[in-house]
């Protein structure tokens, strides 16, 4: 493992109350965002808000930028454009079903991309009921992932460790959701996929710290060290590894943000935020929660 830091002795848990206060603010912000989403006051994508979906086939490859330019000229600026598995097909999603919008899109594409022979293959209306069901399914997916984390950590470690990991994961998901709400970013299925990916990343980061804590618990002689001191020691020991892992993953997410195209832009942004928040929570949220649930007494074996 690459070492970018020497031996450190930082009192991370000495700052636990400040960190937990900051984390509570982020969680509250995320919960507020959930209520706003439920009330339909957030920037919801077509999958959640309902709208119109058009699948268009071309005779030649077409870029999203070309289609975006054509739609902008036609006054359609809020369309969500996605590439399909074949480079000759695209998907256009619109939140609002304006009268004659399908004809407007077809006319604009045929006039500006005549050589590529655009043809609307299918049109799907996404009604409010489908949007509500999608919201419920997305919430269920997040809750199921959280429950899985709780069970996995409880089996691998101890129950209070599972609470710490679950709180840290919940914290990360709520923080990213809250930030996206503040930035007025679109909440869609791609974003939900990012949240589930963040949950998995957060768990991996936390398990690295917990694994070192468990390892050190087996090495420390009875009555020679408090649990807080042992946790600080463990976090410092894996700090370099945590930073290297986070930076490596972050570089990939940043590259995706700048070069991944329009469709993956918000996914990459969510991942960048999730990596930063997840690294923070594995140090300042998961371990302090475990410490607060247990007793900061001399270790007994």
From Swiss-Prot:
Its main location: membrane. The keyword Metal-binding does not apply. Pfam families: Sec_GG, SecD_SecF_C. GO terms for molecular function: protein-transporting ATPase activity. Part of the Sec protein translocase complex. Interacts with the SecYEG preprotein conducting channel. SecDF uses the proton motive force (PMF) to complete protein translocation after the ATP-dependent function of SecA. GO terms for biological process: intracellular protein transmembrane transport; protein targeting; protein transport; protein transport by the Sec complex. This is Protein translocase subunit SecF. HAMAP family: SecF_B (MF_01464_B). The keyword Phosphoprotein does not apply. It comes from Thermodesulfovibrio yellowstonii (strain ATCC 51303 / DSM 11347 / YP87). It is a multi-pass membrane protein. Forms a complex with SecD. Part of the essential Sec protein translocation apparatus which comprises SecA, SecYEG and auxiliary proteins SecDF. Other proteins may also be involved. Keywords: Cell inner membrane, Cell membrane, Membrane, Protein transport, Translocation, Transmembrane, Transmembrane helix, Transport. The chain crosses the membrane at residues 17-37, 137-157, 163-183, 190-210, 239-261, 272-292. Belongs to the SecD/SecF family. SecF subfamily. GO terms for cellular component: plasma membrane. It is found in: Cell inner membrane. It comes from the Bacteria.
